[in-house]
């Protein structure tokens, strides 16, 4: 998605908010745990009231996008956020620092609903939810949508669900067709 926007001439920042660092690795930065500055570093600096420069830690990719990398350090940050004042809005503080430099800022979240994901929801204008066409991910979607509603009511009133994107759909199987139609029945035009 980010590379597609960049190819349309947009300035894009990708934020890897997943401790597995999959986005970082998939963009060719294959050893995210050895990077000096990552999202965990930046958020840690903000928690400690240290100054953060707009370009600090941002990696530039040959496809024309920028990346704020993520790595395993986010797991430790997740635990420490529990005791932080305004813990839901630390990422928002970072986005306010870099927002003017980009047309789009896309945040790749971990599949859990921990504090890092809540930070992403508190920072976002809208979210696109990828869901595998299988029973358990669809069941998890219900909880995710409840959490999005709660964040919208309590922290970020502008948050909207841009869409629900079905992934790993094998349209040749009845199971996938049933899951797809169940989602479309429940969520209507949000399902893509």
Give the predicted meaning of each segment.
Residues 1-192:
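P-loop NTP-binding core
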């Amino acid at each position: 998605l980010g590379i597609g926007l960049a190819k349309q001439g947009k300035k894009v920042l990708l934020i890897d908010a997943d401790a597995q660092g999959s986005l970082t690795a998939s963009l060719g930065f294959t050893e995210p745990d050895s990077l000096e500055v990552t999202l965990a570093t930046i958020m840690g600096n903000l928690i400690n009231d240290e100054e953060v420069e707009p370009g600090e830690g941002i990696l530039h990719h040959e496809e024309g996008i920028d990346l704020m990398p993520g790595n395993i350090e986010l797991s430790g940050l997740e635990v420490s956020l529990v005791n932080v004042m305004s813990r839901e809005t630390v990422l928002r503080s970072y986005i306010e620092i870099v927002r003017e430099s980009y047309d789009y800022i896309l945040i790749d979240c971990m599949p859990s609903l921990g504090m890092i994901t809540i930070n992403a929801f508190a920072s976002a204008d809208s979210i696109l939810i990828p869901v595998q066409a299988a029973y358990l991910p669809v069941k998890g979607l219900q909880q995710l949508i409840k959490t999005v509603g709660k964040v919208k009511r309590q922290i970020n009133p502008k948050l909207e669900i841009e869409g629900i994107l079905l992934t790993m759909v094998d349209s040749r199987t009845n199971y996938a067709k049933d899951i797809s139609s169940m989602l479309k029945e429940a969520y209507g035009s949000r399902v893509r």
